[in-house]
């Protein structure tokens, strides 16, 4: 616990001291799309522990303002996205994949050609099927999806955020084939992959930057 707190404090201090990195908060998809958020200061980014993920689920990062409790509350419940220097994070509380919510806190974003991709826990039938443990019980419906997803709290897949609708779509094999259509060599390499996990998908998304 002390070690985790120390690391978090060091991370916060690094953000503050790194040339006063630009920190911008966005309250909705329109502001993010247009790049017209509000500039703030003294934000702190903490990587959430595996224990925290198992207890409450949600995104990998916690963003708060240690010197401003009301701002911290806003960041948690109402803020849509946060940009700190070149790093962008979206609030999982505001994200939706079909009818499923993605929990709280923040997910890191990979920006590729004006598109926004972020990593989060696999939820729903389309996402969980790709990562469900081999021995997981196969159940039907939402209950089955929830049970399967609960065993995947430390797993990540990519979602693509549509800022016009505010909806997210799972980035699976079919979507990656569309994105790689203009890169035949990359597409051939991708077709050999057997996983849709974030580490695999992300490898090819980064090559499109």
Language-model-detected regions and their locations in the chain:
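Aromatic-patch recognition
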Residues: 24-184
């Amino acid at each position: 616990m002390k070690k985790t707190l120390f690391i978090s404090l060091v991370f916060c201090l690094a953000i503050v001291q790194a040339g006063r990195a630009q920190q911008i908060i966005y309250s909705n998809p329109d502001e993010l799309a247009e790049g017209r958020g509000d500039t703030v200061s003294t934000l702190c980014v903490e990587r959430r522990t595996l224990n925290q993920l198992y207890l409450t689920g949600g995104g990998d990062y916690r963003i708060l303002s240690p010197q401003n409790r009301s701002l911290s509350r806003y960041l948690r419940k109402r803020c849509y996205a946060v940009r700190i220097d070149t790093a962008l994070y979206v609030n999982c509380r505001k994200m939706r994949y079909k009818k499923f919510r993605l929990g709280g806190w923040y997910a890191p974003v990979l920006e590729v050609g004006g598109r926004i991709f972020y990593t989060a826990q696999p939820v729903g039938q389309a996402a969980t099927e790709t990562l469900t443990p081999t021995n997981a019980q196969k159940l039907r419906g939402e209950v089955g999806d929830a049970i399967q997803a609960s065993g995947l709290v430390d797993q990540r897949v990519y979602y693509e955020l549509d800022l016009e609708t505010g909806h997210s779509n799972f980035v699976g094999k079919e979507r990656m084939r569309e994105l790689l259509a203009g890169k035949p060599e990359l597409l051939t390499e991708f077709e050999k992959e057997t996983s849709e996990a974030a580490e695999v998908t992300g490898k090819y998304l980064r090559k499109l930057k």
